[in-house]
Amino acid sequence: MSSLRIAMFLLVVLMVLIDCSTAIPAADKERLLNEVDLVDDDGSIETALINYLFTKQIVKRLRNQLDIGDLQRKRSYWKQCAFNAVSCFGK
């Protein structure tokens, strides 16, 4: 549950940054985008790869958090089984 809160918080922060950056003039917008670096950008392929992999990992975690319908379905199934084993496993 706390990871869902963290993901939602990051999503809200990202939305606020995007909203603020659209209202900022182009020169300030470019400066703001250049200040947000995952790893110090020295132009090397290793740095670009680290940034790519880190971003890919974050996106994967966010996508996994969005698919909670399946988890809720499984949870309700196991609750039913815990309450009435015959309904799950038969006689």
UniProtKB/Swiss-Prot annotation:
Annotated signal sequence range: 1-23
Phenylalanine amide, modified sites: F89
Lineage: superkingdom: Eukaryota
Principal subcellular localisation of the protein: secreted
Subcellular location per the Swiss-Prot or TrEMBL entry: Secreted
Keywords associated with the record: Amidation, Cleavage on pair of basic residues, Disulfide bond, Secreted, Signal
Record-annotated disulphide pairs: C81-C88
Propiece residue ranges: 24-59, 73
Any one of the GO CC terms: extracellular region
Protein name: Prohormone-1
Organism: Apis mellifera (Honeybee)
High-level lineage: Eukaryota, Metazoa, Ecdysozoa, Arthropoda, Hexapoda
